[in-house]
């Protein structure tokens, strides 16, 4: 019997680790922890382009702590996480969130798996995450939460969202 609070997903394949997931994510718990790598590829993203590797790296990063300036794999900040995820498929993204927002192909609508999403936080600079599916994305949220999955439908993220960049075809 699972005694974890509803906001946590039991990361059963990673003994001793839990991942904080926000935004009502029963879908994501099933998606990530019950064979997501075998799911049908998203339009424009094939297994050859690194989808399976990215999913594996997302799984490995969930629950890791947030440390400013960290690039993984033991800890991450937001742009360090994105850089580390993409390094696994041989792409070298810029180190800073602001710079990640100035490279790649601009995307405003029709987000796809792997798109780097950008947020402008008032008085706190830029924040990045990687879009997964539906409205969900993975990001290094901060010291209290570490690497988590959140929803773009959450009020905070809807207000801060500034667009996305596509690195996968």
What kind of feature is each model-predicted range?
Residues 15-22:
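N-terminal export leaders
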Residues 2-5, 42-49, 68, 91, ...:
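Aromatic- and glycine-rich peptidoglycan recognition patches
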Residues 32-60:
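C-terminal segment of N-terminal export signals and the immediately downstream linker at the start
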């Amino acid at each position: 019997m699972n005694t974890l609070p509803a906001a946590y997903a039991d990361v059963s394949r990673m003994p001793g680790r839990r991942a904080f997931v926000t935004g009502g994510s029963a879908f994501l718990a099933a998606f990530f922890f019950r064979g997501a790598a075998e799911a049908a590829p998203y339009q424009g993203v094939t297994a050859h382009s690194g989808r399976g590797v990215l999913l594996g790296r997302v799984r490995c990063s969930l629950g890791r702590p947030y440390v400013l300036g960290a690039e993984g794999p033991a800890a991450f900040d937001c742009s360090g996480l994105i850089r580390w995820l993409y390094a696994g498929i041989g792409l070298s993204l810029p180190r800073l969130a602001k710079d990640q927002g100035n490279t790649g192909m601009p995307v405003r609508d029709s987000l796809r798996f792997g798109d780097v999403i950008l947020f402008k936080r008032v008085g706190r600079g830029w924040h990045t995450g990687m879009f997964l599916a539906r409205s969900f994305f993975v990001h290094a949220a901060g010291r209290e939460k570490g690497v988590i999955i959140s929803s773009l439908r959450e009020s905070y993220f809807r207000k801060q969202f500034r667009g996305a960049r596509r690195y996968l075809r």
